[in-house]
């Protein structure tokens, strides 16, 4: 599992690095970013995974979210993968901004031609953690996950499909009920085919209804002026209703005047990192 | 002086906006970013001008520096212009990344074909402040300036050439002695011609030697692993020697392991905004 370092920049006393590797799950080269806080120089740290939204690479979060100060203070290694395989020469992979490249939706595709490469679910939950645990000073037992929009969807389903794997989960403007929203219908029909039962296995609102697991403290921030909320792409109300019914605690904060941008994320990122640090450093 | 709003995003309770206008000085359309902190809703705030470095637009600083939290807390309106005129159809304007587009060097060009458009000094010190004072809730008497690299050079010369105009000045990795460094020689010979006395009028190290002005508290952060420092583009030692001789107080902090990137700026931006707030809110 050879890693090639692409960049390394000092930031808030730690190091923001980007690496490239040949992904076995995705059958292509993948980049990921990893932040090593000062504490990582002298011991193992918890690992916090960030999943980005549509059209993003590993760069958007590390350059725009302003997360480094709190990650440095709380001593968290923060990992941010790319949002899909790239350069797979699949016909149509670059045709839309909400499907294919930059839009892997954190699922394992079952349909041709996507199934050979589009396995972001297994990449994020299996291959990447194994790579991180093997190459960086992280404690494999202390892992949490969060994300934005499509990445918020990814964080929620990874946590709900793996009870106990993550200490905590949070999301910014997550796609909460993809089986019912335009983005989700387009992605799931393309990657998973027409059998909607396969869709539900990657839908947070459905997963909550049958969540058998342990305590899961979910934090969600949502901008009230988020165009995609108004367009019915995110559907947080459905998710909250399902959590309420199942008595799963979720803190949902509707933020007046905020939108879907990284300005919204930057404003509340410290709260989210504090949320995770509470569990990761417990 | 019609302003066209390009974008507006809520961030740390304030609004990060970008506007476009027809610049009289530069004879072209120019964009600038302005952050209005929550305090700007109820009263006039001080104005802090940021000047960016080579290849930047108004976007780099507002999306990568993480300045919003401290600007919001200290109640400062922060303005970030672009780094040169654009789209002027001057032969060669886009040929190099360190001259022409994205590289206006904050001077008023005297040479053809640049002198018609390349008047960034007057734009930054006259036209933009007049525009800001006329259109935003700012106190014209309370203004400070800071910048990075070429923008650090810009901030230093604007302050040194206008004693009393700015309450404070600071810089990240500034080009301190452009008449002696490759970037400066290329830019000044192109914009100002071969008469080196004209160059010195835009060189911070020379300007300090004849600075008649009032108290000026200068803060400079410089990454010790900054490739451009090692390449002799920045020359801070010359500037510090000149300040020492003239007994002008300058705090110069050499930061171990840091480079020229926005990760370096993000790490110390709060210190700089606090530095300015001390004088602007005095």
UniProtKB/Swiss-Prot annotation, chains A, B:
Enzyme Commission number: 3.1.2.12, 3.1.1.56
Keywords: Acetylation, Cytoplasm, Cytoplasmic vesicle, Hydrolase, Serine esterase
Highest taxon, organism lineage: Eukaryota
Compartments, record wording: Cytoplasm; Cytoplasmic vesicle
Residues the record marks as active site: 149, 226, 260
Reported effect, residue 190 to E: In allele ESD*2
UniProt name for this protein: S-formylglutathione hydrolase
Native species: Homo sapiens (Human)
Gene: ESD
């Amino acid at each position: 599992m050879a890693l090639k370092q692409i960049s390394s920049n000092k930031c808030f006393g730690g190091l923001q690095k980007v690496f490239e590797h040949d992904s076995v799950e995705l059958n292509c080269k993948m980049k990921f970013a990893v932040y090593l806080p000062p504490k990582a120089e002298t011991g193992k740290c918890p690992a916090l995974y960030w999943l980005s939204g549509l059209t993003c690479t590993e760069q958007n979060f590390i350059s725009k979210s302003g997360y480094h100060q709190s990650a440095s203070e709380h001593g968290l290694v923060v990992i941010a993968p790319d949002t899909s395989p790239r350069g797979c020469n699949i016909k149509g992979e670059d045709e839309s901004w909400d499907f294919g490249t930059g839009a892997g939706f954190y699922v394992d595709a079952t349909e041709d031609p996507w199934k050979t490469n589009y396995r972001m679910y297994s990449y994020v939950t299996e291959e990447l953690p194994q790579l991180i645990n093997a190459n960086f000073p992280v404690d494999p037992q202390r892992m949490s996950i969060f994300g934005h929009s499509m990445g918020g969807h990814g964080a929620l389903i990874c946590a709900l499909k793996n009870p106990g794997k993550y200490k905590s989960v949070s999301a910014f403007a997550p796609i909460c009920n993809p089986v019912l929203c335009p983005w989700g219908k387009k992605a799931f029909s393309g990657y998973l085919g027409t059998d909607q039962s396969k869709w539900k296995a990657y839908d947070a609102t459905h997963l909550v209804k049958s969540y058998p697991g342990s305590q899961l403290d979910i934090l969600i921030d949502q901008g009230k002026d988020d165009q995609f909320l108004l367009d019915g792409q995110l559907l947080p109300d459905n998710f909250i209703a399902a959590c309420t019914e199942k008595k799963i605690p979720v803190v949902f904060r509707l933020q007046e005047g905020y939108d879907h941008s990284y300005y919204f994320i930057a404003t509340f990122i410290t709260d989210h990192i504090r949320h995770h640090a509470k569990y990761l450093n417990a």
